[in-house]
Amino acid sequence: MKIIAKIPAWMLLCLFILSPTTETIYTSGLPSLTRCFSIDGCITQMTSTLYFLGFAVGILSLGRLSDIYGRRPIVLLGLFIYIVSSIISIFSFNIEMLMIARFIQAFGVSVGSVIGQSMARDSYQGAELSYVYAILSPWLLFIPALGSYIGGYIIEYLSWHYVFIFFSLAGTILLALYYQILPETNYYIAFSQSSKYFEVFNIIIKDKMLWLYAFIIGAFNGIYYGFFIEAPFILIDQMRVLPSFYGKLAFLLSFASIFGGFLGGYLIKKRQVYDKKVMSIGFIFSLCGCILFAVDSFILEFILVSNVFAIAMIFMPMMIHMIGHSLLIAITLRYALEDYATVTGTAGSIFGAIYYVVIASVTYCVSKIHGETISNFSLLCLVLSISSVISFYYICLLYKKKSIIIN
């Protein structure tokens, strides 16, 4: 692959973090939105479902457009859409208008994920690409948690409208900056229009292993984002925790994720543990965390405990799960597309759209089972974790079958 320009790592970071940080800032204000529009919390939570569906549509379409017209113009277009939709959200007079605006916002911000990854592959190769991802990983885990912290303070001292004002300002700064210095990294613009997009699409649709990987990634990310859309109602509304303090609690999950990342690196590099075994360890952490979460949630439903103890009973199991999340997801993303090395960009956009639909489905389930306790959500987490383990077992069987055919 010919490299015509290199995008700096910090510019990649800004692209990568924009979507998850947008969502974690926003979810801190869900109880406030519910009171403002005088609606049920489950309806407010569905704005996140629309967000992830919009993200899936954006990944599928904007990723393809960047192959045809170049990375730079589509990134700028996506940021412009993000800004306009954030401004519309400020003036939303009902929840339906906000839902539409959130869908459009996610469509625009999806450039950060799909095109950010494409620009990284355009700019770096081999060990250099691995190094760039390695130095960005801690920040990718830390900054979204910082989003909850920022969102908590905005909600506590201002109102939910200022969350979207913040998004508008951040998007405007990025758009102005990227308009000046964002390089074009796609060398194959002239050749992309003849790429076999639909041929790849048809192959992926029939690939059982890819669908199983997509389910695992979608389920684990669904648990993560589902927690952020359910926890504010439990902690802020039911337990009367201040939004700013809730934002600080989100750092606990971030620290667990960072620990999981370092543990994965230690197991692979220092202990020479092969990838599939590290994934198995990740599933064990997740399953243990989700079982403990389910047990704790039912204890909290029937036994009155102090807020401090209740918070520990909610966050400790999720921290255990997040260690497993970090051990698992990066390796899963690597193996999912190993058979699509020559069409990584196209396959990646289709694969990303699939697992974001899974995330949207999980968040929809969270909204449908929303209640005054967290026990329903904890059971959903347990079901998703067990289902992911079963999916991984089936993947291992498919690998064995594949190796037998080759030999």
Curated annotation (Swiss-Prot):
Topology within the bilayer: Multi-pass membrane protein
One protein family per Pfam: MFS_1
A GO cellular component entry from the record: plasma membrane
Subcellular location per the Swiss-Prot or TrEMBL entry: Cell inner membrane
Entry-linked Gene3D superfamilies: Multidrug resistance protein D
Molecular function GO labels: xenobiotic transmembrane transporter activity
InterPro entries, alphabetized: Efflux_drug-R_Bcr/CmlA, MFS, MFS_dom, MFS_trans_sf, Sugar_transporter_CS
Entry-linked PROSITE patterns: MFS (PS50850), SUGAR_TRANSPORT_1 (PS00216)
Stretches that traverse the bilayer: 3-23, 43-63, 73-93, 95-115, 135-155, 162-182, 209-229, 248-268, 277-297, 308-330, 346-366, 379-399
A biological process from GO: xenobiotic detoxification by transmembrane export across the plasma membrane
UniProt family annotation: Belongs to the major facilitator superfamily. Bcr/CmlA family.
Protein name: Uncharacterized transporter RP603
Organism of origin: Rickettsia prowazekii (strain Madrid E)
Taxonomic path: Bacteria, Pseudomonadati, Pseudomonadota, Alphaproteobacteria, Rickettsiales
